[in-house]
């Protein structure tokens, strides 16, 4: 159904010249159609591998449907997805046109890189399993509609890796990254502007953050809200695992088991000390400032401890490693479950 929905405007309207209106907007909409068709096929590729490629609206006829239900080898499906994304890239406007709030050229390039990397690594690491076209035990080799096809798995892997690198490079070379200024928490009374990297995940607008390619804006006045920032403050029966926390390196680049600077895990403060600053920024610990906004009831108080033993699931952290990512120190955004900050 998703494929048909994407195909209809592309094949029945644009190519026939029957769609009228602003030419630039129409091009962008068609680009979105190719993007979402590629997304539909990518999801099916991940689930099924080999699958039919349908490039037109089919008649409601059993013979026609059966004829078009022949499974195409997965590498050809992946190439088809990349072709759709190339078309999307050629039609879509850049991120700046709609401030990153619509599918854009850069987002399509990044998605192309993801698709290509997925297929390259799948074929590389599943070679010989019977799931890759070219394997001796690949079931598709016995299908008459694949007769005469030859597959070089190594060549396909090289092709997809190259496509992934080229697409990603076009995005990375033109995206200004948000700088982490190494400030781990604000001073009391400082609400915003203390660390742009931390605030990137919860500020009201990301229009001027070029590295965020696609984002959704929330508005309390329009009754469009979410509760992520409030929930990470209260616990919400969530939490990072100990294994995840231990996977972060020390700031000197060493793993915790190889560093004399690791202070152990008697407290979360100890766990975070001297570690990768992403762990320091995005996990609450005993001394972390809870509220810096003077209007907040718990202004200038420390977090103290996660509610790991609390029977109320809404304010319980089930692991003790309570996320601080997506939190905002603007109390007007977090008095209750209705938030207006952005979502990436």
Locate the predicted segments by residue:
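Conserved, well-structured interaction surfaces
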Residues: 1, 7-48, 64-105, 268, ...
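An aromatic- and glycine-enriched ligand-binding surface/loop that stacks and positions planar moieties
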Residues: 1, 49-51, 55, 86-87, ...
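Enrichment for repetitive, rod-forming helical segments
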Residues: 44, 112, 119-121, 331
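Short, conserved phosphate-binding/catalytic loop or strand-edge motifs used
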Residues: 56-62
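Primarily recognizes Gram-negative and organellar outer-membrane beta-barrels
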Residues: 61, 76, 127-128
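Short acidic (Asp/Glu) and glycine-rich catalytic loops that position anionic groups and cofactors
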Residues: 62-65, 143-145
């Amino acid at each position: 159904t998703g494929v048909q929905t994407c195909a209809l405007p592309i094949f029945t309207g644009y190519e026939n010249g029957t769609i009228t209106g602003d030419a630039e907007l129409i091009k962008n909409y068609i680009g979105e159609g190719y993007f979402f068709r590629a997304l539909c096929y990518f999801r099916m590729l991940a689930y099924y591998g080999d699958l039919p490629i349908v490039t037109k609206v089919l008649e409601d006829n059993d013979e026609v449907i059966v004829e078009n239900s022949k499974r195409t080898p997965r590498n050809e499906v992946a190439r088809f997805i990349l072709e759709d994304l190339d078309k999307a890239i050629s039609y879509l406007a850049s991120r700046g046109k709609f401030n990153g709030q619509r599918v854009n050229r850069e987002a399509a390039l990044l998605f192309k890189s993801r698709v290509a990397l997925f297929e390259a690594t799948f074929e590389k690491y599943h070679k010989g399993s019977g799931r890759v076209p070219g394997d001796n035990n690949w079931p598709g080799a016995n299908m008459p509609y694949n007769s005469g096809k030859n597959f070089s798995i190594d060549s396909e892997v090289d092709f997809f890796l190259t496509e992934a690198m080229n697409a990603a490079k076009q995005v990375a070379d033109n995206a200004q990254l948000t700088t982490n200024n190494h400030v781990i928490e604000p001073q009391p009374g400082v609400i915003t502007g203390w660390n742009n990297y931390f605030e990137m995940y919860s500020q009201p607008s990301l229009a001027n953050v070029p590295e965020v390619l696609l984002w959704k804006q929330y508005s309390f006045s329009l009754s469009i809200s979410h509760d992520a920032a409030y929930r990470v403050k209260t616990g919400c029966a969530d939490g990072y695992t100990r294994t995840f926390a231990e996977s972060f390196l020390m700031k000197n680049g060493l793993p915790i088991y190889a560093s004399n600077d690791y202070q152990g895990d008697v407290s979360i403060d100890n766990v975070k000390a001297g570690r990768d600053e992403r762990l320091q920024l995005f996990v609450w610990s005993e001394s972390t400032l809870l509220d810096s906004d003077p209007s907040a009831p718990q202004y200038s108080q420390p977090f103290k401890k996660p509610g790991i033993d609390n029977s109320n699931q809404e304010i319980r952290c089930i692991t003790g490693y309570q996320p601080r990512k997506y939190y905002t120190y603007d109390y007007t955004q977090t008095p209750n479950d209705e938030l207006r900050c952005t979502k990436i």
